[in-house]
């Protein structure tokens, strides 16, 4: 809603691009939506003032911003436009391996070790450049850790 009448860019062929096009049609937001061939060009368009905002998955935006010469010149804002479950793919008939993965994921979550792992990779400086993404845990991820399961809730 805050973007009504603005010019947005997103990367060609991505889910966020499809979602914003649909939202624009359904909510009559009057957005100008531009497709960029890749993330680098979309980010460049925002930095050069050719677009007001770059719509993309939050983790990608945090990563792109963190690697700019002045990361504080960009800010990731707003609510989720889409939610897309991510998963671990295992060999279909390897029951023993699935059990190991399930048990370890459950242990990481119930012991709260998952928070330290998250902090290590998303809040603290990481290799190779020692850049921090500064990406806080989303409410959706935090809620998913309350009830560990191997079922996708969608």
Question: Which functions belong to the PLM regions below?
Answer:
Residues 1-154:
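Proline/Glycine/Serine-rich low-complexity intrinsically disordered segments
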């Amino acid at each position: 809603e805050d973007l009504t009448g603005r010019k947005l860019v997103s990367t060609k062929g991505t889910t966020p691009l499809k979602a914003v096009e649909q939202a624009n049609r359904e909510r009559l937001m009057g957005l100008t939506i531009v497709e960029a061939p890749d993330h680098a060009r979309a980010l460049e368009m925002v930095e050069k003032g050719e677009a007001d905002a770059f719509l993309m998955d939050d983790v990608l935006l945090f990563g792109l911003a963190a690697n700019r010469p002045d990361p504080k010149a960009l800010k990731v804002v707003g609510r989720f436009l889409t939610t897309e479950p991510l998963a671990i793919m295992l060999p279909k008939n390897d029951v023993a391996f699935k059990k190991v993965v399930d048990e370890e994921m459950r242990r990481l979550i119930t012991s709260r070790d998952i928070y330290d792992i998250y902090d290590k990779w998303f809040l603290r400086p990481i290799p190779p450049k020692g850049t921090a993404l500064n990406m806080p845990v989303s409410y959706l991820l935090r809620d998913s850790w309350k009830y560990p399961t191997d079922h996708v809730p969608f």
